[in-house]
Each structure stands twice: as C-alpha cells, then as structure tokens.
Amino acid sequence: MFHLGYSQVSDHPIKNLKQTIIILLCFLSIPSYAQTSLTLSSYDLPPYIGQELKDQGAVHEIVEAVLAEANRTVDVVFFPFTRAVNSALAGQYQAVFPVTYDDLLSKGFLLSNAIASYQLGLLGRKNDDSSLEKISEKTTIALVRGSISEQEGNSFAPARFVYVAQNEQAMRMLQSGRVDYVLIDKFTAADLMVDKLPYMIGLFAFPEQFTKKVDLHLAFSKKYIGAKTDLDAFNSALKRLESQGVIDAILNRHGLLFFENTSEEKVIRIATVANGDMVLMQRISAEYEQLHPGITLDWRVLDESILRRRLLSDLAISEGQYDVMTIGAYEVPIWNKQDWLSPLTDLAVEYDQNDMIDVVRDSLSNRGDLYALPFYAESSMTYYRRDLFEQAGIEMAAVPTWDNIRTYAKKLHAPEQGVYGICLRGKVGWGENIPIVSTMVNAFGGQWFDMQWAPQLNSSVWHQSVSFYVDLVSAFGPPDTHENGFPENLKLFSEGHCAIWIDATVAAGMLFDAKRSAVADKVWFAPAPVAETSKGSAWLWVWSLAVPSSSKLQDEAKEFIAWATSKDYINLVAELEGWVAVPPGTRKSTYENANYIQAAPFAEYVFSAISSANPEDATLPNSPYSGIQFVTIPEFTAIGNFTSQQINAVLRNKKTVDEALSQSQAFTVELMKHVRASQ
C-alpha cells in the first residue's frame, strides 16, 4: 500500500504532510487580523511558478491578478516546499500556494477554487499497444519521494513504487529499462527532457488512460482570522477573471493553455511566435476562414522562447497538440530526421518553389523535398540613428567592427535624455541572447565545438567575446538588458531610446514604417559588426510553417501554410499594410518588385545578406557542425538554453564571466558524454 511516513518526507512540492500537520496544529500561533495587504508563502514548481520564470510563472501571475481584482495587495516569499506550507500553517503567512487537495491538508487550511491544474500521469516508452496495458503487481513506477498524496498514489495500485530523490534520476531509470513508468507532470517531464535530457525526446509518451488532471489551489491558513473573508473575495474575483478570459490569457502567455476538445471537425490548431509579422498573419487569416467556411483556425501566439519550449516539449512526450508549427532553420533538419514533419510534396505549380531564395529553400529541404514553408527569413545587421551620429560628429563605418560599435555607443550614451548607447538582446533563451553572443564569438574567431566535438566554451575566445558583450551592455545599454529580447528592443529603438541596435533584418520593415516607428526618418543601417573575421558575424534564420506528422488534418493544414507563405499573401499584406510591411527574405520576386524596392531602402542589403549566408562555413577555425548562431544537433537546445541562463546571470551580477563559462563548459561536456553513452 502506498504510504508516506514523516521520516520519508523530502523537501518536494506535492506531498503528504499528515504527521507534520498534526504536530503543527498543536503549536499554532496567535491569529492575525484581516488585512488588505497579504503576505503569502510559495515555492518553485516550474514551469508553473518559480523565481527564475518570466513574471515568476503563470500561477504567481494568476494569484496576483485575482487578489488585485479583490482589492488586495500581495507580497510573495519563496521557500522550499515544506517550509512554505509549514510557515503558513503556523500563521506566519496568511496563505500558501500552489497546493493540491488533501484531506489532511484541509484540516489546517481553507482551499480556494482551482487556480490552475497540471496533468499527472505515467510516462512510459512508446508502445503501439499502450492502450491495452494495465497496472499490475509487476508494474514498477519511479517517482520522487513525497511527490504525491496517499490518495493519488492509491489510484495506481497495485503497482510497486520505486522512490528517488529527483525526477531526472527517475527518467534515467526509465531510459535504462529499470522501471516501467515515471509518475510525473506532463510539462515537468517535457521541460526536463528539453533542458537536460534531449536525447530522450520522442522516446516516451503518456498513455491517456494513466493521465489525470490535478487542480492547484491557494490555501488560506485557518489560523488567519481573515481567512474566510479573503477566501470568499478571492473566489469571487477568480470567477470574474475567468469569465473575462483573463486566466486563460495568462496561461496562454506562459504556454500552459491546452486546446479544448471541440465537436467541430476541422479546427486547425496553430502555434506561432508573438512577432509583428505573425500577429499580422493571425489578423489577416480571418480572410482565409471566410474563403474556407468549413475551417476554423485556433491560435496560440507565444513568446519566442516559450514557443520553442512548448513545441519541442509537445514532441518530447508525443502529445500531438498542433496542426501547424512555427519553426526555424534549426528544427527542420533535425525534426525531419525523426519523422516528426510531413513532407510538402504536393504544392501547386503556382506556389512557385523556384521563387524561393536558394539558401532559404535549402535550409528547409531534405533531398529536394520541402518540410516547411518559409514565412520570413532574416540575417542580422546594425541599425543606428543617423541624427544622433550627425549631432555627435561621428560617422558609421561601412563595415563596423565591435570596437567601433563600443566607441559609438560610449559617445552616444545619454540615459538622462532617455537614449541608451546600444541595445542588445539579454533575455534567457537559445534564440534570445545566444544569437548575438554566438555571432560575436564567431566574429572574434571562436566556435562551439572543435573538430573532435570538444566543447570550447571555456576557451580564451569565448571569455573575450562574452566579457566584451557584458561590459558593452552594462556600460552603455538599458539597465534591464537581461529582460530584453527582440520585441523589447524593437520597441525601445522604434520609440527613440536606442542609438544603436544590432539584431534581425526583419526589424527593418517595422523601423522604416512611419506608422509603426517614431524614428522612421532617422534610422539607417550597416552590416553586423565584425572583429577578427567576418565569417559567421551575421546570422541566418528562417521562421517557417510546418505540419507535424501527428496532425489529423494534414491536407487542411498544408493548404493553410501554402496560403500564408504564397505570393498572393505577400500581395495581400502589401495591399492592406503597404509594401514596407510585407514578410521579407523568402522570395526573389519580392526583391524584384519595384514597389518593394521603393518602399524598402534596405531591400538590396537584406537580400544580399541572406543570399550570401553560409551555415556550412561559419567559423574561422574548422567546425564539425553546420549553423551560424546555433549548432544543428538535437542537444543544442539544452546547451544553448543553459549557456544563455549563465550569461544572463552575469548580466544580473549573480555570476562572473569565468563562472558562467566554466559551468556552461561542464554542463556541455557532461551532456555530450550521456549522448555518446545512449547511442
């Protein structure tokens, strides 16, 4: 029988607190009086809540929003799980969150209505007969000790539980065949694979019959005298925000909103990135629905890093949520090898594949067959304020070096006037701060791996490059550089707060558009900076639309992505928004169009930068990999994300450059060791 005694309790989020609660109920503190300002205890439970998550996670944001709606202000203090619960139980904090329902827990707390939920299930190896499997005495299930209540454990009887200290340990046991299943939340398992165990992606799945929804609650301590009043106010406010769609919007923003089951037969479920061109596509797609009355489009528009994580995590646990995925030049060759993408071999003649820019088409193809269709493509370049340069009496070099950029940024940095010398990406993510750091490393003569696949993250070139980057943005960038990615810097520059910005060429269409930019008549451009070499100093990326092989609406999804990436779509955007706003970088015909050339003074440069990019030869020393700002291996998402986190910590003064790079090197060495062992 499943049971947790007090001696077994570990410091883990969801656990049986039976004996702890009994003891603490005997030593309760003096009640406090009802307050409009609340102090709550919580703990890290990624991806739902955590001190390192964006806005501290969806659950944190929901609780803050609900209490604000209830006219309460709130301060949240993070502890390890046991201390978070015990502190609230003892009356030191008015409430704790998130918790799951438990008979024992309810003796010391008043639980709110559900604020969110997670999907608890058994993760096992992919098996065509998994739907026929049953739990028996021979079934072995690994789980973190204390991670579920006795009630939840009983639902998996008569299986034998194998207790471990960490989910990562349980996952390795599953991979080696030492257990049949791991009992774990879906998103937790998926994120673990994405971040630390990428070689396990696609090997496992959650059989539907062994998965259930578990609600999360805010729990008010019964020793807080205002508990009942605040509980009622919280539940009422929660209900109002739910009816207004606020809760779903928060969950969606964090990539935690599942698609609803629908009786409609043809709902195309689309995941895309919250960039301007994609948001415009979503708006214009209403015309597509009018032309296809039997089709409904259901969108998830997400932050770039969250999109990447949710798409890969969907594949990691074989969920199959999406019909259309927005992916890039990194994913296509890797996912194609795993048979995760449907080939696009039946495109109509008028689609005109030969009109695609060669390097763009090649990056999305295998043996001549396309596996994704390009929505827009980009390189990187330097944007700068001509007016500020003229006022300072300086001139942008025809091909600037990074030393030039530092000199300019120092001269133009005027934060007291609301202008920063330079804006660069600093946000965590292999697609956020890594592209700028990686191309800088290339320019300084470095690489991710040498020809023997030995990681180079602790090399002198990496130290030089990252130190230069950190010093540059710390001295002459916005104080919140560590929070800024593409959209944040686009906003800063377009509103006149950056003298220099080095980022994607796709931003040019927005910066030169007077309807969307306050500096449209003041901005100009130059190539991305170089240093020891120009090789790999500017990146190549292709945001594209693909249909996963798991989609049940193959034909419908393919028809939609063909429409969204067609010449007709480009003409439609030009008609509605102007030629400067059309998705760039994909079709030769766009750059042959006199209307586009007239509207986009950057057109010739962007076409040349994209066309000349060479992902096969992007580093000064020979490298065993393809890719400019990324390495085209499955493990790079984990390596890039980890390295990104360490560099971000340096920007926040939490680590030194030496610490960040030595830890990144150690992580990469260990990961590649596991990869070789698993092959």
Task: Locate the predicted segments by residue.
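Glycine-centered hinge/linker elements that transmit conformational signals in sensory
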Residues: 408-411, 451-483, 524, 528-529
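Hinge/lid segment of periplasmic solute-binding proteins
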Residues: 328-379, 403-404, 433-436, 520-526, ...
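Extracytoplasmic "Venus flytrap"/periplasmic binding protein-like
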Residues: 109-116, 287-358, 363-365, 391-393, ...
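Conserved C-terminal helix/tail region of periplasmic/extracytoplasmic solute-binding proteins
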Residues: 248, 252-262, 296, 390, ...
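C-terminal lobe and pocket-closing loops
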Residues: 153-157, 507-518, 531-641
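Extracytoplasmic small-molecule ligand-binding "clamshell" domains
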Residues: 35-103, 107, 298-306, 310, ...
